UniProtKB/Swiss-Prot annotation:
Its cofactor is Mg(2+); Mn(2+). It comes from Brucella anthropi (strain ATCC 49188 / DSM 6882 / CCUG 24695 / JCM 21032 / LMG 3331 / NBRC 15819 / NCTC 12168 / Alc 37) (Ochrobactrum anthropi). PANTHER family: CHROMOSOME TRANSMISSION FIDELITY FACTOR 18, DNA LIGASE. This is DNA ligase. Residues 642-721 form the BRCT domain. GO terms for biological process: DNA repair; DNA replication. The gene is ligA. Keywords: DNA damage, DNA repair, DNA replication, Ligase, Magnesium, Manganese, Metal-binding, NAD, Zinc. The lineage of its organism: Bacteria, Pseudomonadati, Pseudomonadota, Alphaproteobacteria, Hyphomicrobiales. InterPro entries: BRCT_dom, BRCT_dom_sf, DisA/LigA_HHH, DNA_ligase, DNA_ligase_AS, DNA_ligase_CS, DNAligase_adenylation, DNAligase_N. Zn(2+) binds at residues 430, 433, 448, 454.
Length: 721
């Protein structure tokens, strides 16, 4: 993550950063909610979300349609049928300190108006570390069970839910005709340890932690597997109810108990921040002895009428907040440091540890974040260890399970350091493809520059290459890319972009099983795939540049370069000429080509350095050569036809359902006539083109007095009627 403070970001940098954060947070949402295998801690995830929110607060007109601030969870997994929740399953805001809790309580009082101190009751309940579930009953009979999914649509796991003994299949007489009980499916620590002992005895790989195991168990296609896992449930909330049997949160908890649902015995009704914090600390002291994982305490306004008055923000209720626990710690020996290469080329140091139990989980690896963290330097250049020491192999280290997910080393027991311990030297070369690794100014992370050739990044790079705004090859989605990348037959393999364009020829020459005879394909779909590939042998220059996956060269910057250089030959020539003659240097500021690169509108030194790094790496140039040999030709950008255009230099927003063109076609047309496009309406907007169904953007335009026209008027305006 970049170190540039939010208040110092320029608008182009903010656009780039919001694009990166949207992509990165979506990736981690997918890992956590859909795949049950998170790769970063809760704290690191929360930091990404907070940075995204801070940038959006400073640049509200840059909020993306795919912004993490507008999304809950992730889309449901395709192997299960989808269930639309009658009432959305929203996430909660987080508190990380006593002050955060006091601020939350204060905000409730301020919103509700003048009230006596401590007059509002709150419930406080342990935050179970499991999988959120909504269970629907109609006329007392269990009808469906669904995961939270993206908050609006979840996965139908009804068959598996029925195997959980603690969830009643039938409600007692007198229950409302429609009831949705919400709660958390989890696995007890004792059952988790027993399962791992069984797996080890059978010579199978053991599981990482109870939360992931519970989530994976619930998503089994075979309900017998789910039944064997001894899953449990705590009820704590509700969705649709045809009639409310209580008027307080605590009253509903008691109703759940009467209906036969387990409710957490540590739930209490309290008043004021002091009582909430005292209960939080009491639960924290009991945490290690509990037979289930918890990662905090949830506070809710008790009276339901006050909950209704307080209402909701876009993704979370105003009447509730989750107070997170700090991570648990233990001491062990650092045996080694390995370097892993992530899907985006980031080099991450990983500590290999003498096995140690932290919070009930055996830990053998821990993240070391980056070079600076090993040296004891924080994100803002501050020293993060009191006596300014680094981390060395052989050290006795303090390990923390941050967010109960990814362990990290937080400190060193310096008195136990051996006399011959030496500082760790961070590599400047990718351990996977041996391309040079660079660390951009203002960043803490080294990144491999062999993006198109590095095996660690290959699948992600190919997915990006064929994505909608790049080569847009229909029939090459995520699953197909995974299939071709891992294919054992060389005539089917797609390891680099050039392989896409030689696939048909290689298949024609193959004596082995043909693609159309492989399950999941067929003659028709294979023909469509080949046609889609061949249709992209000639590709618009900006799409080609975006498809290369050069760091910081997103869709917007790719268009800027295309408009500035007009041909790929001119762009490549400038990039190669800007490569410094001295190995190890990243820029040659006296170089004319370098000055030309940074002079492109909206392009600064950070983006230009990324371009130069890409072209300085011989492996990338080799991949490009192979791409051209395979018959790919970037089509020269047409110079803007906007001379005298009435929209030249204006900012245009398209909204509603366009009937004569797609949204992408509309944006391309506007840019062709010299206009800029935006995704939201602000004071900087000059024109709004509204189709049927235009909503909030149309209202905002009217409020700001911005000109609004329909689609037909747009075509007339630009002279294409």
């Amino acid at each position: 993550m970049t170190d540039t403070p939010v208040e110092k970001l320029t608008e182009p940098e903010a656009v780039s950063e919001l694009e990166r954060l949207a992509r990165e947070i979506a990736h981690h949402d997918e890992l956590y909610h859909a795949n049950d295998r998170p790769e970063i801690s809760d704290a690191e995830y929360d930091a990404l979300k907070r940075r995204n929110d801070a940038i959006e607060a400073r640049f509200p007109h840059l909020v993306r349609t795919d912004s993490p601030s507008l999304r809950v969870g992730t889309a449901p997994v395709s192997k299960f049928a989808q269930v639309v929740h009658a009432r959305p399953m929203l996430s909660l805001g987080n508190a990380f300190s006593d002050d955060d809790v006091r601020d939350f309580v204060g905000s409730v009082y301020r919103f509700l108006g003048p009230l006596p101190d401590n007059s509002i009751a709150f419930t406080a309940e342990p935050k179970i570390d499991g999988l959120s579930m909504s269970i629907r009953y109609e006329n007392g009979i269990l009808i469906s069970g669904a995961t939270r999914g993206d908050g609006t649509t979840g996965e139908n796991v009804t068959t598996n839910i029925r195997t959980i003994a603690e969830i009643p299949n039938r409600l007692p007489a007198g229950a409302p005709s429609v009831v949705e009980v919400r709660g958390e499916v989890y696995m007890a620590k004792s059952d988790f340890l027993a399962l791992n002992e069984q797996m080890a005895a059978e010579g199978k790989q053991t599981y990482v932690n109870p939360r992931n195991t519970a989530a994976g168990s619930l998503r089994q296609l075979d309900a017998k597997v789910t039944a064997s896992r001894k899953l449990k449930f705590f009820a704590y909330a509700w969705g649709e109810m045809s009639d409310m049997p209580a008027d307080t949160q605590m009253g509903m908890v008691e109703i759940f108990r009467e209906w036969g649902f387990p409710v957490n015995p540590l739930t209490k009704r309290l008043h004021g921040a002091d009582e909430l914090l005292a209960h939080y600390r009491a639960i924290g002291l009991e945490r290690a002895q509990l037979d289930y994982d918890i990662d905090g305490v949830v506070y809710k306004v008790d009276r339901l009428d006050l909950q209704t008055r307080l209402g909701f923000r876009s993704r979370s209720p105003r009447w509730a907040i989750a107070h997170k626990f700090p991570a648990e710690q233990a001491t062990t020996i650092l045996r080694g440091i390995d370097i892993q290469v992530g899907r985006t080329g980031a080099l991450t140091p990983v500590a290999r540890l003498e096995p140690i139990t932290v919070g009930g989980v055996v830990v053998t690896n821990a993240t070391l974040h980056n070079e600076d963290y090993i040296k004891g330097i924080g994100l803002k250049g501050e020293r993060i260890r009191a006596d300014e020491h680094d981390i060395r192999v052989g050290d006795t280290v303090i390990v923390q399970r941050a967010g109960d997910v990814i362990p990290q080393i937080v400190d060193v027991v310096l008195e136990k350091r051996k006399a011959d311990a030496t500082p760790f030297v961070f590599p400047h070369e990718c351990p996977v493809c041996h391309s040079h690794a660079v660390r951009e100014e203002g960043e803490a992370v080294y990144r491999c520059t062999g993006g198109l050739t590095c095996a660690a990044q290959a699948v992600e790079r190919i997915r990006h290459f064929v994505s909608r705004n790049a080569f847009d090859i229909e029939g090459l989605g995520e699953k197909q890319v995974e299939f071709f990348f891992h294919a054992e037959d060389d005539k089917l393999k797609i390891k680099s972009p050039a392989d896409i364009f030689t696939l048909q020829q290689r298949q024609a020459e193959s004596p082995l099983k043909k693609l159309e005879n492989i399950e999941g394909f067929g003659a028709t779909s294979v023909k469509k795939l080949y046609d889609a590939i061949n249709d992209r042998r000639e590709i618009a220059l900006h799409r080609f540049l975006f498809g290369l996956g050069i760091r910081h060269v997103g869709e917007v910057n790719a268009k800027r370069f295309a408009r500035a250089y007009l041909s790929y030959a001119a762009f490549e020539e400038a990039a190669l000429e800007a490569v410094p003659p001295k190995e190890g240097d990243r820029t040659d500021k006296g170089n004319e080509a370098w000055q030309e690169l940074i002079a492109v509108e909206g392009i600064g030194s950070i983006v230009a350095e990324a371009v130069v790094d890409f072209y300085a790496e011989p492996h990338n140039r080799e991949v490009l050569d192979n791409l051209f040999k395979a018959g790919v030709t970037p089509v020269d950008e047409v110079a803007l036809v906007s001379t005298g255009s009435p929209v030249e230099g204006k900012t245009v927003v398209f909204t509603g359902s366009l009937e004569r063109m797609s949204r992408d076609e509309a944006k391309a047309m506007a840019e062709r006539y010299g206009a800029k496009t935006a995704g939201s309406v602000s004071k900087k907007t000059d024109l709004v083109v509204a189709g049927p169904g235009a909503g909030s953007k149309l209202a905002k335009a009217s409020e700001l007095g911005i000109e609004v026209i329909d689609e037909d008027a747009w075509f007339t305006l630009v002279g294409e009627e």
